[in-house]
Design a protein with these regions (language model features):
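Q-loop/switch helix immediately C-terminal to the Walker
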Residues: 14, 20-33
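Conserved ABC ATPase signature
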Residues: 56-60, 64
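Walker B catalytic motif
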Residues: 56, 85-86
Length: 132
């Protein structure tokens, strides 16, 4: 209806994870009813190769934790994905691989990226506008 806002998902600059939950449970927390655990686990394994999807957050490295947050944002329903410094803490290889997955899974949704690294914005290479 007119005036309604479409839902969006977000990766915050600071971690917003449920520490006592598994990586898989953190991803599923906002997924809609059409996302099953096996699909979420497959995305986690794509973004975080070798991850134990049942591992608690304290067992994961900072980069792994960051990619769990990105997986959650990509699985959440909505017309937009907001990423605030999403690649912080990722090494170059993980950053490149994660960027590719983000691009592959946007599926027509709007992406709003906040970053201090112009290379991140250029790597996503889908920008209509880049503001410095």
């Amino acid at each position: 209806a007119a005036g309604e806002c479409a839902p969006c998902s977000m990766v915050f600059q600071d971690a917003r994870l449920v520490e006592s939950a598994s990586a898989l449970d953190n991803v599923l927390v906002c997924a809609d009813a059409h996302v099953d655990a096996s699909s979420a686990a497959a995305l986690l394994r794509l973004l975080v190769p070798g991850v134990d999807v049942d591992a608690r957050m304290a067992e994961l490295s900072g980069g792994q934790r960051r990619r769990v947050e990105i997986a959650r944002a990509l699985l959440c329903p909505g017309g937009a994905v907001i990423l605030d410094e999403p690649f912080t803490g990722l090494d170059a290889a993980a950053r490149d691989a994660t960027t590719k997955v983000v691009l592959d899974l946007l599926d027509g949704r709007t992406l709003l990226l906040a970053t201090h690294d112009i290379a991140d914005a250029q790597a996503l290479d889908i920008s209509d506008i880049i503001t410095l």
